[in-house]
């Protein structure tokens, strides 16, 4: 009988993987003569090999055409951001007009809050999760202060209520119901960055809208990781980055979703000339006429060099399909979970929920013995060419990415944990 937790079985799974060829589409950092075992796509995705050619194309056109590159050819810069629109829409489950690649995540969050956070005397509170990513919290607190409101009274945090530090849907529902008459906005992550917990977006939308609150999501750790259905879920807005699972490079341009029901609304917004409708933009008229859909929230002309790697990555997502990627992801992360329980249960505690529907590819791990032991294991793994990442105070995050990670990589990780624990 085959040992389903053996390296030999993992190698067989790799050989049978219908997505195995996608690994060759990425550039891997090297450790000695071998590829690094890379589990940090949740922090910075690997470079698609095609990205260099697409960046070079932009540079070549800049050199050959200079300013005329804005208006010449199928990859003209005037509409370059639209080259990623359809692919992004497929990844997040949106209509093409509901998405735009622009700015960065925190900038886009401020722009969305300028439109969707409309406090009144009775309804001015914002609900977030306790332990939110710091940039989100900074943005929320600063928006409250801009409106003359005190975060101490108008920022509501939902505390973790489960043993591993995760948040139940019951706790979220109770908080929304309790504070409903005060809520102007619910802002929630698709996946919590430290614990790896995924949330039911559609249910959060339903709960928030039942109380009359707008609802938005930070999808930094969800986009390209989970299949999303933002349009059908009725999300008001969402923001995300493209440098994690979307592999668009360090500091990559961000992404934004605005539901179609807001496309032609009179929502106030922070306006800029690239948000003006395209046909009359270069008339330089003083009156702002927004482009329909999410593009109407653009401020400045797109960063074409930053968009080029995103084109390369989205082509791979189209080649694979989100359903197939998610199926492999569930297998990879489930296999990693089984290996940890079977071989290093005394060394590692899994923080992330066990139910596949409540997680993406990431497993967040605590090391027995506390922070110092955790750091020691983290440094051991790094020295061995097995790269995860560390999040204070005591979590190692391991994210097997289905585009380029293998089942045998999981064994490399667990073998190194065993070697460290035995030393």
UniProtKB/Swiss-Prot annotation:
It catalyses: L-kynurenine + H2O = anthranilate + L-alanine + H(+); 3-hydroxy-L-kynurenine + H2O = 3-hydroxyanthranilate + L-alanine + H(+). It is an enzyme of class 3 (hydrolase). The modification N6-(pyridoxal phosphate)lysine is found at residue 244. GO terms for biological process: anthranilate metabolic process; L-kynurenine catabolic process; L-tryptophan catabolic process to kynurenine; NAD biosynthetic process; quinolinate biosynthetic process. GO terms for cellular component: cytoplasm. It comes from the Bacteria. InterPro entries: Kynureninase, PyrdxlP-dep_Trfase, PyrdxlP-dep_Trfase_major, PyrdxlP-dep_Trfase_small. Keywords: Hydrolase, Pyridine nucleotide biosynthesis, Pyridoxal phosphate. It holds the Pfam family KYNU_C. Catalyzes the cleavage of L-kynurenine (L-Kyn) and L-3-hydroxykynurenine (L-3OHKyn) into anthranilic acid (AA) and 3-hydroxyanthranilic acid (3-OHAA), respectively. Belongs to the kynureninase family. This is Kynureninase.
